[in-house]
Each structure stands twice: as C-alpha cells, then as structure tokens.
C-alpha cells in the first residue's frame, strides 16, 4: 500500500511536493538484488522537518501552507503506468516484475487533495530530482482542477536528466504513454521525440 503525508495549514494555501530518489529502466538498476537506483519502499519514509518543511522558521514562505508530501518508490519519476517485466541478465535469474505505478500513486494524492482542500487561492507544486521531472505535468492537472487559483511550479534538480536516445527511453519501460496523451495539453507528445523538457513545454503552453 502507498502512503503520503499531509500537514494541515491554511485552507487557501497549498504546497504539493513530489519526493525524489532515482529511477530505473534496466534489470540491473531495477532489481533489488542487484544495484537498485531508486527507493524500494516507502514504509519507513519519515516526514522531513528541514528546508521548506521547517515550519518553525519565520522566513519560510510556506510555513502557513497546507502541505501534501508524495513519497516515491516506483522508479518511474512518478509517471509510470505499467507492470513491466525485466528478463534475466544473469544465470539463475527469473523474470522480474516491477510495478511502475507512480501515476496511480499520484492519483491517490490528487484525489485526497481535491476532496479535502476545496478552494485554495495559492498553490505551489514542486519536487526534487525525480520529483522535479513530473512536477509541471501535475501542476497542469492541478491548475485545471482549481481554475480560480494562482498556481506556481518549480522543478528542483531535474536538469541532470538530459535528452534521451534510442537506447535509453525510460518512458517506454514505465508505460507513460498509457495515459499521458489523454490529458489536455499533452496530446501531442510522442515516444520518439519525448524528453523531460517536453513536460515543461507542454505545461507552459
């Protein structure tokens, strides 16, 4: 089961944060028994009380916000929609199924938010590293749901993920195109030309 954190604050101020933590799209980096490059489980995730989450700091611009914090454990930068089979790469291994279901986890976050934060006036959507990559996509969805709100978005640390090539197309392993073309503003995306900047450009347009 997935879990996320909520800090109740002002009803008109909302901060949504997507946790970072690596990603995987090869057997070697997805397999927990090899060299996994992502957080495997959110069961022991604890809420951070530093940086923008240090609400005791007088100069924290988010100290009064309601905060929804989305932990990350799916290896798909929060935008996967596939139970992907990774075949063996070493003798004695069996097929490995990784549940790249970050989109479903984020949908749970959004559904709770929509049901419990009715009319925010100011919304800020952000994330770090792997959480920065999908933040414009989710900011776009959130802006559509709250048309009267002022929505800002900032991706912190996504710049290290550069343009993909034919040998490195993680969004295909993650099943991102199982859903993203159904969302308004993202219909024109295609797997061949996809890069992470595409999400920022589509959200801005």
Could you describe each region identified by the protein language model?
Residues 128-140:
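Glycine-rich nucleophile elbow surrounding the catalytic serine of serine-hydrolase chemistry
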Residues 1-7, 47-57, 137-139, 195-202:
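Short alpha-helical segments and helix-capping/turn motifs at coil-helix boundaries
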Residues 7-116:
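Active-site machinery of serine-nucleophile hydrolases
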Residues 1, 83-84, 97-124, 139-205:
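Surface cap/lid and interfacial helix-loop subdomains adjacent to catalytic sites
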